[in-house]
Structure formats: C-alpha cells, structure tokens
Amino acid sequence: MHNDIRGLPITTDSATAAHAFDHAVDGYLSFRSDLGARVEALLAADPECGMAQILKGYLGMLAYSNQTLTMARTASATARGLMKHTTKREQAHGEALAVWIEGDAGKASAIWEEILRDHPLDILAFRLHHLNNFWYGRPDVMLATVRSVERHWADTIPGFNAILGCRAFAHEESGLYMEAEIAGREAIRRDPGDLWAAHAVAHVLEMTGRRREGIAWVETLQNGWDGCNNLKHHLWWHQAMYHLELGDMSRVLHLYDVRFRELDSPLTKAVPDLYIDVQNAISMLFRLTRHGVDVGDRWIELADKAETRTGDCQNPFTLPHWMMALAATGRETAARRMLEGMRDYAQAPGMNARIVGEVAIPISQAVLAHGLGQYEQAVGLMRPVLGEMSRLGGSHAQQDVLEQLFLDAALKAGLDDDRRLLIERVSGRHPVPPAHRRGYAMAA
C-alpha cells in the first residue's frame, strides 16, 4: 500500500506505480496530450493496480465515443477482479465507472459526491464530478460541490490550482461572473499554463461582452499551451467567437483553418472526430453561414465523419451538431438514419438515454427541418424543449448556436411570437442585451 501525493491510499506494492498514478492524474487535471501514455506507464508499473485500470476506464469514458466505451468496459471488468482487497474509496471509484459505462452519469456523480464527503482531497473524484455535471447541464451541482470541498483545501496541497479553475468555471456557468473572474485570474497568476482557468475567464469575457479583452487574453496565454490537448482548440474557438462578434469574419476563417480545425495538426489527426473539436467546428460554420459568409467546402469533412457516428450517442450535445453537418450538405437520408440510431439508443435504461430521447431527438429533428427549409416545423419541434436544452450539456456560450437556429427558423417562418420568446429567453440568460449581439441584433 502506498499513498498518492495528497495522502490518499493507493492499493499497490509498487512505489513506481504510485508515482505514475500521480503523474497520470496530474495529466488529467492539466489537460495534457500525453495522458494516454501516462496511464499506460502506470499500467506497466503495476498491471494489478485496480486504480490504474479504473483510470484507464475513466479515460475511455471521457472521450464520449462508442469506440472508447469498449475500452472502458474492458478496463472496468479487469478492475472488478482486482478490487476485493482495496479500500472502500477505490471500490467506490470502480462502482462509479461501472454505472457511468451503463449510461447513468447521474449515479456516477452521486458516488463521486459520496467519495468527496469522506475524502475531499480526492481530486480525481472532484474533477470527474465537475466535468460530468457540466456535460449534463447542472451548474448548480458543480457550484455546490466546489463550495463543499474547497474549505478542506489549502494552496500548498498539490492540485489546488485545479480547485481554483473549477471554482471559476462553476461560478461562471452559474452567472456569478465577478467571482469566476477572480478565481480564474488567481489560478493563472499561480500557473499561466492552466488551461481550465484560462477557459473559465474566456467564458466570463465572452458573456460580459469584453471581446477585445478576450482576444488579448487568449493571445497572451497561448504560448504556454504546448503539450496540452484539444481543449486549447476550444480556447481558440472562443477567440474566433470574439472576432465574429466584432465582425472580422476573415479572421474567424483563419482561426478555423490554422487553430481550432487544423486538419493536419497532430491532435486533430489523432482523433479527427473528437466531440469538442466537432462542436467547435460545426457551431462556427453554422454561425458564419447564417451571417452570409462563404465557408467553401468546410462542411464536407464534418458531414463525412457524421455518417460514421450513427448510433453513437455518448455525448448528447454533439448530436445536433452532427445533424447540422448532414443538413448543411443535403444528406437527408444519412440524417434520418442518424435519427433512427438515436431512437434505438433512447430505448436503453439510464440518464443518458433519457436525455437523448427527450431532448436530443426533438432538437436534432428541428435542425434537420431547418436545413430542409421547413422553418415552421423546426420551430414547432424545438419550442417544447427550449427549457430543457440545458440537459444536453454544454455552456451558455455553446448552447447559443441552438438558440440562434431557433431564432433563424422563427424569423424565416414569420413567427413573431416565437421570435419574442427567444429574445426574452436570451435576455434572461446573457448579460449583454440581444441588440448588442451579432446573432440577435436584427431580431431584438
């Protein structure tokens, strides 16, 4: 038995494995592109370490794809055979992984909360809880957990910066922008390469309409992101969003091609259809197209990838994005095939399947109807679930693309009541008035 760097027991006879565990967890906290290699080094140091197998399973789940779900299942099954003589905390991690694999992130979240009640320094449970609740639209839960855990931490404990970054983002998604910015900037002061803290402040600057500050924020910090994973693409997407609001469409296209959708970059080549990259690219192309910008053939590679993901519903928020790509390229047959795959998936038990059935399917149907020019139908499909969209996950800034689609359909269908409904909705969710936002000004 050894302890991790925060003093929590890890069931392994290998000091090398214990150090490798810390190195892998640090890679997860800091969004390192070599996280997979770190986990493999941990497994090589002690293949019988239950937490090593669980960490591999968590890594598979965090990619939100059917392909890596298979990897997670295998790791979970292996871990199950190794957990008999481990600690209750480690066994709870094994249970959380197992229920997450079965599509119930809500149960997994509850288990991580139980772990944190007894072990508030379990940074792995904390970050998994934070990100999962983000992807299921529960900022209130994110914030409550930050507040309950952070009092047990001190700035001398390894991983404290991750607590600050999560504090910043939980406050931002809860609309508490001043508190979010203070925490995020403090995290960056301590570690300028902290990607999650940089991301939280980028959200604050976007939501408060400080676009030129946002551009400077990203440009100042980006040289410290070498070795980081695809989250840096998302920061560059935020940079493009600032430029879009300022009307600099040529700069947006430049950032698309050389920053957040650079097809020849090693990160993109490694996983060409990673959910966050797909969301970045498709949502930006939709916005640009709506503003009359010629995006050339950029839709095609995304639609090609969409066709290979039929039935893959691990990340519900990605599904309407795939549908946008299929609709934009006129692939109605493939789009209907994807909808059928969603319907099949929605028959399964678990929280994820319910969200797909109750929210992702009607919104994806609306996206297709919009793409087919059936604007009144698109509004009718989407209107009943506008208030449920947060369950898909994604930030306020990310969900904006779906709100813009609804508004565009309402305007083109001449549905003035629905136009007003949407404008009132975004007015209550965003501190910048619609009249001062490029996607809404013409309808405000």
PLM regions and their residue ranges:
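Generic helix N-cap/helix-start motif at coil->alpha-helix transitions
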Residues: A15-A20, C49-G50, T86-A92, H119-F126, ...
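Inter-helical turn/loop elements of alpha-helical hairpins
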Residues: A15-A18, H23-E40, A44-E48, Q53-G106, ...
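Internal metal/ion-chelating core segments
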Residues: T145-L246
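Helix-coil-helix junctions within alpha-helical repeat/solenoid scaffolds
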Residues: H243-A444
